[in-house]
């Protein structure tokens, strides 16, 4: 990951906020420990913290390119998986490249295609482009919402950043949460409504959205939407198509100029990805490094649940034997998990999933000692129906979020004066209804097919975003 942040002040010289920009950049240093950079002109200043993965020496940011009529400056966090194809297409249109990194491809794509460049990108990204002559800022976020991007309008301008904590470093962004923000945390958390930054003036660029900020306001719109289409393939064709898509996605994500490994829990998703990664690295003459986490005395105290019906270690060892990889174990105990609760929440900027977050926080720290990039099977359950609510009709047909049965328990944590202002059941129901009404369906869908399309969108916009927030 990398960190991006910046501000635009159309009515005054942005230089007066130089110290604020440096503070905003500093709190993002964990996202990008390798390099830092700052761009500044009269009305715009942007900063970047880089985790170098491709073209380590020449991929520095912010990155500026000029045409005969405009100067464009980019700050970018992400990875493009179709970089070679885009580079070739852009070169045919006259683009000249001086680096091998995807950052320059993003910038050249914007120079040639404008906002429509997002429709051509296969990847994960959040970026901003400042057009110096036009005095406008372009913001964009990937289709699924893997890379974060928040913003806040301030008097005469706008600030943006990869994380909420960076925005809060600016003096014009109040550290205020109103009753709507409280309801987001306590009634919908760890999820939150799309576009909501919880704090009173902070908003999120929604996934699959892009647009411009100008002196007259900010205008964002979707460039992609999940669409329902008739499925005409038979079972064998479907299996082959999914196999090729997964293989292609995994292979494209193995492009890196730094060490790369995989998470390995022994489950279907991580085992499949590790197998694919192993094949790619073997072809390069390299050995795959795999990583697993376990807990002290887990063999004594493990209790199965809907989410984890089996303990992992036996399956992990079976995959280790099959892959013949270089495996690394991280064993955590309860005091370690407890000590990491606050750092993990601070990294997320909002209350999260308690020990689920703290364990990942510690696990990733251990992984970084060996590799810079690691493939994970996270979100496979959301995309491929791995959760109980996809299969259990008693949960699936419930008129509400399948992972949240009642608001009564959560409402008891509100003080009386807040509880009187919020109808918890109505608030949660409205959030649920707003999501399922956006689900695209076909006229010929059966009730089950229609419900499964709704379930997919619920998972994409809510449960999955909770996991992606940790990216």
Language model: regions and residue ranges:
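Cysteine-centered catalytic environments shared across enzyme families
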Residues: 1-347, 360
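Glycine-rich active-site loop/lid subdomains used to bind and stabilize high-energy intermediates
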Residues: 8, 43, 48, 155, ...
């Amino acid at each position: 990951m990398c960190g991006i942040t910046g501000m635009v002040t159309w009515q005054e010289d942005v230089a007066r906020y130089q110290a604020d920009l440096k503070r905003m950049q500093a709190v993002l240093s964990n996202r990008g420990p390798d390099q830092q950079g700052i761009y500044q002109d009269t009305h715009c200043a942007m900063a970047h913290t880089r985790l170098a993965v491709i073209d380590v020496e020449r991929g520095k940011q912010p990155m500026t390119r000029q045409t005969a009529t405009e100067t464009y400056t980019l700050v970018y966090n992400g990875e493009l998986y179709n970089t070679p194809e885009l580079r070739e297409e852009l070169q045919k249109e006259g683009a000249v490249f001086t680096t091998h990194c995807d950052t320059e491809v993003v910038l050249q794509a914007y120079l040639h295609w404008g906002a429509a460049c997002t429709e051509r990108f296969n990847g994960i990204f959040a970026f901003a482009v400042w057009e110096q002559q036009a005095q406008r800022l372009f913001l964009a976020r990937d289709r699924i919402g893997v890379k974060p991007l928040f913003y806040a309008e301030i008097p005469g301008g706008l600030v943006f950043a990869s994380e909420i904590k960076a925005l809060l470093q600016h003096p014009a962004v109040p550290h205020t949460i109103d009753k709507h923000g409280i309801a987001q945390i306590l009634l919908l958390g760890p999820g939150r409504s799309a576009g909501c930054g919880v704090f009173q003036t902070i908003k999120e660029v929604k996934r699959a959205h892009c647009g411009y900020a100008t002196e007259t306001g900010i205008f964002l719109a979707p460039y992609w939407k999940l669409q329902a289409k008739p499925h005409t393939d038979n079972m064998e064709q479907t299996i082959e198509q999914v196999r090729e898509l997964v293989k292609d996605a995994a292979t494209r994500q193995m492009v890196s100029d730094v060490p790369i490994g995989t998470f390995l829990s022994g489950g279907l998703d991580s085992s499949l990805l590790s197998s694919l990664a192993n094949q790619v690295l073997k072809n390069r003459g390299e050995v795959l490094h795999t990583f697993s986490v376990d807990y002290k005395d887990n063999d004594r105290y493990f209790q199965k649940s809907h989410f984890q019906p089996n303990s992992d270690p036996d399956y992990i060892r079976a995959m280790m034997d099959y892959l013949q990889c270089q495996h690394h174990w991280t064993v955590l105990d309860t005091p370690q998990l407890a000590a990491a609760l606050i750092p993990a929440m601070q990294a997320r900027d909002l209350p999260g999933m308690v020990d689920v977050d703290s364990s990942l926080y510690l696990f990733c720290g251990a992984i970084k000692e060996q590799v810079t990039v690691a493939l994970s099977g996270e979100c496979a359950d959301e995309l491929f129906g791995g959760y109980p609510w996809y299969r259990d009709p008693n949960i699936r047909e419930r008129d509400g979020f399948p992972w949240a049965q009642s608001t009564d328990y959560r409402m008891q944590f509100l003080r009386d004066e807040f509880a009187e202002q919020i109808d918890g059941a109505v608030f949660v129901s409205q959030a649920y209804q707003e999501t399922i009404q956006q689900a695209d369906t076909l006229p010929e869908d059966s009730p089950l097919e229609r419900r499964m399309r709704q379930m997919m969108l619920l998972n994409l916009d809510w449960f999955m975003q909770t996991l992606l927030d940790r990216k």
